[in-house]
Amino acid sequence: MKIYKDIITGDEMFADTYKMKLVDDVIYEVYGKLITRQGDDIKLEGANASAEEADEGTDITSESGVDVVLNHRLTECFAFGDKKSYTLYLKDYMKKVLAKLEEKSPDQVDIFKTNMNKAMKDILGRFKELQFFTGESMDCDGMVALVEYREINGDSVPVLMFFKHGLEEEKC
């Protein structure tokens, strides 16, 4: 299994256990599912249940959301109220990624520059339909993943988008 981590923050963003596709050699699209998890209170083994207070069965907790977001502890980010603020973030973030690429993978620089401009225009064109998520550290200097809901075979499917060159693969 491969874990994909943000090259700036080191946050775990997703794993290759999900259906995914590489678009224009710069964006990973990861297909998620809406899920609800339920968990009970922790019970100590060997405890005498009759000596405890009566359990009313109402202590079940649940969390709902996109499986990729929940499993990798991504946090929704509300920092981008308009296209202009997101564009400023993208330009700054892309400079950081470009500096890392020039240092570690100079052969990828031209691919990144050429294809990223097209991808950015496409993303900015759909800005109002997107949700934004940071890694567990909630550091907006790192990668901000995008979530868009798309109609696929009659279902609304959450599709997460991650910038390929802003990730490092780690084999587990």
Curated annotation (Swiss-Prot):
Recorded GO MF terms: calcium ion binding; guanyl-nucleotide exchange factor activity; protein kinase activator activity
Keyword Calcium appears in the UniProt entry: yes
Keywords: Calcium, Cytoplasm, Phosphoprotein
Compartment(s) where it occurs, according to its Swiss-Prot or TrEMBL record: Cytoplasm
Top-rank taxon: Eukaryota
Annotated GO CC locations: cytoplasm; cytoplasmic microtubule; nucleus; polytene chromosome
Main subcellular location: cytoplasm
Entry-linked InterPro entries: Mss4-like_sf (IPR011057), Mss4/transl-control_tumour (IPR011323), TCTP (IPR034737), Translation_control_tumour_CS (IPR018103), Translational_control_tumour_p (IPR018105)
Record-annotated TCTP domain positions: 1-172
Transferase keyword on record: no
Gene3D superfamilies (alphabetical): Metal Binding Protein, Guanine Nucleotide Exchange Factor, Chain A (2.170.150.10)
Modified residues annotated as Phosphoserine in this record: S50
GO annotation terms (biological process): cellular response to gamma radiation; double-strand break repair; mitotic G2 DNA damage checkpoint signaling; mitotic intra-S DNA damage checkpoint signaling; positive regulation of cell size; positive regulation of multicellular organism growth; regulation of stem cell differentiation
Modified residues (Phosphothreonine): T58, T61
Family designation: Belongs to the TCTP family.
Alphabetical list of PANTHER family matching this protein: TRANSLATIONALLY CONTROLLED TUMOR PROTEIN-RELATED, TRANSLATIONALLY-CONTROLLED TUMOR PROTEIN
Role description: Involved in calcium binding and microtubule stabilization.
UniProt name for this protein: Translationally-controlled tumor protein homolog
